[in-house]
Design a protein with these regions (language model features):
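Short beta-strand
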Residues: 63-66, 103-110, 146-150
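Sparse, context-dependent recognition of short Cys/His-centered cofactor- or disulfide-binding micro-motifs
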Residues: 62, 100, 156
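Helical (often loop-to-helix) elements that flank the catalytic cores of nucleotide-handling enzymes
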Residues: 85-98, 118-146, 177-181
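Histidine-centered divalent-metal-coordination microenvironment in nucleic-acid enzymes
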Residues: 76-77, 96, 102-131, 162-174
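Short acidic (Asp/Glu) and glycine-rich catalytic loops that position anionic groups and cofactors
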Residues: 28, 111, 177-181
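DNA replication initiation on ssDNA origins
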Residues: 1-74, 82-92, 149, 167-168, ...
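Catalytic "initiation/cleavage/transfer" segments centered on a nucleophilic residue
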Residues: 142-181
Length: 181
């Protein structure tokens, strides 16, 4: 659990909450969707016990990978295909292996793929995001494919204090078994 927390470290001033129990499958796209209010920021400090609740299956959480200094320890390409039924995961995995890319594919909650890259220490978020962006053509992905961290610099939140967290990414291994690599 300590290793998991070290790997998925980022902005700790707030964390995302995803109420997976109320999720439904969109009949048109096949994507798992959440109802309004079931996918939101919780403006409390992200402490180690919250990570443990995620791993134990009590609370599904997400994190903003970019910290207050504009650095990150991980990033990812979020592949949400137009048609999940005919999505060729093997093509993506074959490209990772062919080019010996430091990416780990993990199933997303909607059965797409998150292609993670992990760093030993915090690195400039803009540089990591640029690296991931440059990989999109290799995987035949559109230039508007989601890449996290979405924000490479957090801005001050004058109303709440602290920082505006931007967008979070749901963390894998909810209940220690779901969405494995």
């Amino acid at each position: 659990e300590k290793k998991y927390i070290q790997i998925f470290d980022g902005y700790r001033g707030a964390y995302g909450v995803a109420n997976i129990k109320n999720a439904y499958v969109d009949p048109d796209s096949g994507k798992l969707k959440l109802k309004p209010g079931d996918y939101r920021w919780n403006y409390e400090e992200l402490k180690d016990n919250i990570y443990n609740e995620h791993l134990n299956g009590t609370k599904s959480i997400g994190i903003q990978p970019c910290n207050e200094e504009g650095e990150t320890k991980f990033g990812l390409i979020d592949i949400d295909p137009a048609n999940y039924e005919h999505f060729d995961k093997k093509f993506i995995i074959d490209k990772i292996q062919e080019y010996k890319l430091p990416l780990i594919p993990i199933l997303s909650k909607s059965k797409g793929l998150h292609l993670y890259i992990f760093m030993r220490k915090f690195v400039d978020a803009a540089i990591l995001k640029s690296f991931l962006s440059n990989l999109l053509p290799l995987f035949k992905l559109k230039s508007d494919t989601e890449i996290f961290p979405k924000q490479t610099q957090l801005t001050k939140d004058l109303e709440r204090g602290g920082y505006r967290p931007g967008q979070f990414i749901n963390l894998p291994y909810f209940n220690k078994t779901e969405r494995r690599a």
